[in-house]
């Protein structure tokens, strides 16, 4: 190969030499490619002809074989974007770079998230490429206070606006002269006076528009800056032309438009200031989450208590937390007992009792006891840090509904410039032949009324506010895509254990005396069965003292047999009693049947071969489960239960909570197949689960919803995480999705409708340029303001027929 290039790719998923050989063989089948795959280093070195192949082709080949190529993710702060055309252009350029897998740019947050292959490119190259487009970019510093930076930028915008307004106000009075025949001092109509006021507004205050326009045009793009610069420059320089004619004596009554250019810039700055202020409110939810973190921790060093900054705490450090203080990091109690307010995580206001060996979560509040704890997770690994990360990613992500706006934004400015030019030609040749001023005014109005900003802000602002509001209620969407997909759900499948039920068996019914219960609990205390644990806990709640067993024997499939203090104990089913010639009275037999039909595990107790009691144990239904399912039904959503339990138990639980469809006796590996069956019927399915065995079904479903009290595997596989275990958050999540998508549609309707209606009206000469400019400035503000309504969203689902 004469013209060759070499690249190295990090490969994931290889387990043996067969894997590396397979990848190497497949790559070498490509023309003019020489590939070597090393299993030990997990790298593929590929020499190729760049005229025939690119790196993405090799990546696709590897992924098609079922392996992965390692990617890194970087978040970038970008300043200088003024409208959707800017963010769309940056995104398009980044996605065309070698080594970039995917890039998204968010106009609202002024950030980019880029997934890239580290062997092909790096973060510095990404920053440099953005800077070449004329924008400032830097790698996001998570330790930097973003709030103060944005506050400073907002203050700078306000100062520029005030200066511009002070200079433009006298010029604005000239407009009232034309509109209302007002009398004003002659000074205000003096061309020199107008020139002196308008020039600093045009070239000092408005210099940012020229810089932005130049950088965009130099790189083959066009944005809002181009429209503003061209429109205001046309008015300003035509006024200069008229002023020169006046100085030469060619005219005694110059037609000046200094007020148009200056007032336009002021109005646009006013709109941008309002927009920035409104956008800063969209991130309030994230700020509130960050404010939950403790600032310091009390560490135990050499027997002394020392206060240190939170970022200096390491895994394994011994910390002391006193009443009224926040738990600094995630950890485990090694001394003391207390009650902890975990409402920030679970929404449950009642404090949770904590003892030695119990886990505690950072940023929760220690209520009434001093505890000593060991730090197990710190920094970015804590529960709160992971919640913040999910919210950040959701707020910076894109929903598919935004694609149309992104496509249009890329062509918007050139089309508007073309329409403005056509407007000028039509006016000067057909409407007012040979008359320059009306043609100029109409074309300027077209330029300044067009607003690509509203298009770019319509979706991301709603996503930011909607996901933030959901997070405040304990609902974590992992991205805008999932917000959009959730509103289409018409079927919800709930796992039973740990989702509908608490996942912890408890004693629901007991008939017998305390001595029988004491002997029963003593017999069961050495058993590892979860039902035994429930019985022991029940006895402890009754403050009964447990003794020791003399003998203990499990009777497989039937129960247990034990000897305690010369008492012979039998605990089990009918068969165990029959085998030991113990008869059942009819009322006991009826009770046993009743409990079993109700989905409970019922056990008979015999002491010294005489029946002395009956006890029933069951996994109880969660509080509000019935209410949550009723709300889902009211929303027109079908609810089904999926479980590995037998049909009788499953139907008993389903009857309690109001579920009609029960899919029982399902093996864990069959859950995903059951979801697929529902999807084949044309249903949009959400799966709700909490266990490791739910993960495949969560992935298979259109939307996977993990209960936050569940396993990390389930949470990782899900698209939405419900903090705590409250099922009422499921209908709230669906309503939040519907409300957010409805808000996005309102924004897009306004953004498209405004431009579709506004541009023709301006072209017909029905709007003065300053009115058009005011409309443009306020259009994006209206979109952001509408999105901010979601902050007050009450997550109360509506009936489908409401």
Swiss-Prot record:
Q: E.C. number, please?
A: 7.2.2.8
Q: Which GO terms describe its cellular component?
A: plasma membrane
* Pfam families in UniProt: E1-E2_ATPase, HMA, Hydrolase
Q: Where does Cu(+) 1 bind?
A: 16, 19
* Positions of Mg(2+) binding: 690, 694
Its primary localisation, in coarse terms, equals: membrane
What keywords tag this UniProt record?
A: ATP-binding, Cell membrane, Copper, Copper transport, Ion transport, Magnesium, Membrane, Metal-binding, Nucleotide-binding, Phosphoprotein, Repeat, Translocase, Transmembrane, Transmembrane helix, Transport
Where is this protein found?
A: Cell membrane
Membrane topology listed for this record: Multi-pass membrane protein
Q: Which InterPro entries match?
A: ATPase_P-typ_cyto_dom_N, ATPase_P-typ_P_site, ATPase_P-typ_TM_dom_sf, ATPase_P-typ_transduc_dom_A_sf, HAD-like_sf, HAD_sf, Heavy-metal-associated_CS, HMA_Cu_ion-bd
Chain residues that bind Cu(+) 2: 83, 86
Q: Which GO annotations describe the biological process of this protein?
A: copper ion homeostasis
Q: Can you state which reaction this protein catalyses? A: Cu(+)(in) + ATP + H2O = Cu(+)(out) + ADP + phosphate + H(+)
Query: Where does the sequence pass through the membrane?
Result: 161-181, 192-212, 224-244, 256-276, 411-431, 438-458, 748-767, 771-790
Give the annotated active site: 495
GO MF annotation, one: P-type monovalent copper transporter activity
Look up keyword Nucleotide-binding and say if it applies: yes
Identify the PROSITE patterns for this entry. ATPASE_E1_E2, HMA_1, HMA_2
Classification via Gene3D superfamilies: 3.30.70.100, Calcium-transporting ATPase, cytoplasmic domain N, Calcium-transporting ATPase, cytoplasmic transduction domain A, HAD superfamily/HAD-like
The yes or no answer to whether the keyword Cytoplasm is present is no
Which NCBIfam families does the record associate with it? ATPase-IB1_Cu, ATPase-IB_hvy, ATPase_P-type, copper ion binding protein
Similarity comment: family membership: Belongs to the cation transport ATPase (P-type) (TC 3.A.3) family. Type IB subfamily.
Q: What does this protein do?
A: Involved in copper export.
What name is this protein filed under?
Copper-exporting P-type ATPase
Q: Which organism is it from?
A: Staphylococcus aureus (strain MSSA476)
Its taxonomic placement starts with: Bacteria, Bacillati, Bacillota, Bacilli, Bacillales
């Amino acid at each position: 190969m004469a013209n060759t290039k070499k690249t190295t790719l990090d490969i994931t998923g290889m387990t043996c030499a067969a894997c590396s050989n397979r990848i190497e063989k497949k790559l070498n089948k490509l023309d003019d490619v020489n590939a070597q795959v090393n299993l030990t280093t997990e790298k593929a070195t590929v020499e190729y002809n760049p005229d025939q192949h690119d790196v993405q082709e090799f990546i696709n080949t590897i992924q098609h074989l079922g392996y992965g190529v390692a990617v890194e993710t970087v978040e970038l702060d970008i300043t200088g974007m003024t409208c959707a055309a800017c963010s769309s252009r940056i995104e398009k350029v980044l996605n065309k770079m070698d080594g970039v897998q995917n890039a998204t740019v968010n106009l609202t947050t002024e950030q980019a998230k880029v997934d890239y292959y580290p062997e092909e490119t790096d973060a510095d190259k990404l920053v440099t490429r953005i800077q070449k487009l004329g924008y400032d970019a830097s790698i996001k510093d998570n330790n930097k206070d973003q709030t103060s930076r944005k506050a400073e930028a907002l203050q700078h915008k306000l100062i520029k606006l005030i200066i511009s307004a002070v200079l433009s106000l006298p010029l604005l009075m000239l407009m009232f002269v034309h509109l209302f025949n007002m009398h004003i001092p002659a000074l205000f109509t003096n061309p020199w006076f107008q020139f002196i006021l308008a020039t600093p507004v045009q070239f000092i205050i408005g210099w940012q528009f020229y810089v932005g326009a130049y950088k965009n045009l130099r790189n083959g793009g066009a944005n809002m800056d181009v429209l503003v610069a061209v429109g205001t420059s046309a008015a300003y320089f035509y006024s200069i032309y008229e002023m020169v004619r006046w100085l030469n004596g060619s005219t005694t009554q110059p037609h000046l438009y200094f007020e148009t250019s200056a007032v336009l810039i002021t109005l646009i700055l006013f709109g941008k200031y309002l927009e920035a202020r409104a956008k800063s409110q969209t991130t309030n939810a994230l700020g509130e989450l960050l404010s939950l973190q403790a600032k310091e921790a009390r560490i135990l060093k050499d027997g002394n208590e020392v206060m240190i900054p939170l970022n200096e705490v390491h895994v394994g450090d011994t910390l002391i937390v006193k009443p009224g203080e926040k738990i600094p990091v995630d950890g485990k109690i090694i001394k003391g007992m207390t009650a902890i307010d975990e409402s920030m995580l679970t929404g449950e206001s009642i404090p949770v009792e904590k003892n030695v060996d119990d886990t505690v979560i950072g940023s929760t509040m220690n209520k009434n006891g001093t505890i000593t704890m060991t730090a197990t997770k710190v920094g970015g690994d804590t529960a709160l840090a992971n919640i913040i990360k999910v919210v950040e990613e959701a707020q910076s992500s894109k929903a598919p509904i935004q694609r149309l706006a992104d496509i249009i934004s890329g062509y918007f400015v050139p089309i508007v410039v073309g329409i403005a030019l056509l407007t000028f030609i039509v006016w000067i040749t057909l409407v007012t032949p040979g008359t320059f001023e009306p043609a100029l005014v109409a074309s300027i109005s077209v330029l300044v009324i067009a607003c690509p900003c509203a298009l770019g802000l319509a979706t991301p602002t709603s996503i930011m506010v909607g996901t933030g509001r959901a997070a405040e209620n304990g609902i974590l969407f992992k991205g805008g895509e999932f917000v959009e997909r959730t509103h289409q759900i018409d079927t919800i499948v709930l796992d039973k254990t740990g989702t509908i039920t608490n996942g912890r068996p408890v004693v629901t019914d007991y008939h017998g005396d305390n001595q029988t219960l004491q002997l029963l609990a003593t017999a069961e205390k050495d058993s590892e069965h979860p039902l035994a644990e429930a019985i022991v806990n029940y006895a402890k709640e009754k403050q009964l003292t447990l003794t020791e067993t003399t003998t203990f024997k499990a009777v497989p499939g039937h129960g247990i047999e034990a000897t305690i203090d010369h008492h012979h104990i039998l605990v089990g089913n009918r068969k165990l009693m029959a085998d030991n010639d113990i008869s059942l009275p009819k009322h006991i037999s009826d009770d046993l049947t009743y409990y079993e039909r109700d989905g409970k595990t019922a056990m008979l107790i015999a002491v010294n071969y005489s029946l002395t009691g009956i006890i029933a144990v069951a996994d109880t239904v969660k509080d509000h489960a019935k209410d949550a399912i009723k709300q889902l039904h009211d929303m027109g959503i079908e609810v089904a239960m999926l479980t590995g339990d037998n049909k009788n138990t499953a139907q008993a639980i389903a009857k309690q909570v109001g579920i009609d469809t029960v899919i029982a006796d399902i093996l864990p590996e069959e859950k995903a197949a059951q979801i697929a069956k529902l999807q084949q019927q044309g249903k949009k399915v959400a799966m709700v689960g909490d266990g490791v065995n739910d993960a495949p079904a969560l992935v298979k479903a259109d939307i996977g919803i993990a209960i936050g009290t569940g396993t990390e595997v389930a949470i990782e596989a899900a698209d939405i995480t419900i903090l705590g275990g409250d099922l009422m958050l499921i209908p709230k999540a669906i309503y939040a999705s519907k409300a957010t998508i409805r808000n996005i549609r309102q924004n897009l309707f306004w953004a498209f409708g405004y431009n579709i209606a506004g541009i023709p009206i301006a072209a017909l000469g029905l709007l003065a340029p300053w009115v058009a400019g005011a409309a443009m400035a306020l259009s994006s503000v209206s979109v952001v303001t509408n999105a901010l309504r979601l902050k007050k969203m009450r997550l109360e689902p509506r009936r489908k027929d409401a």
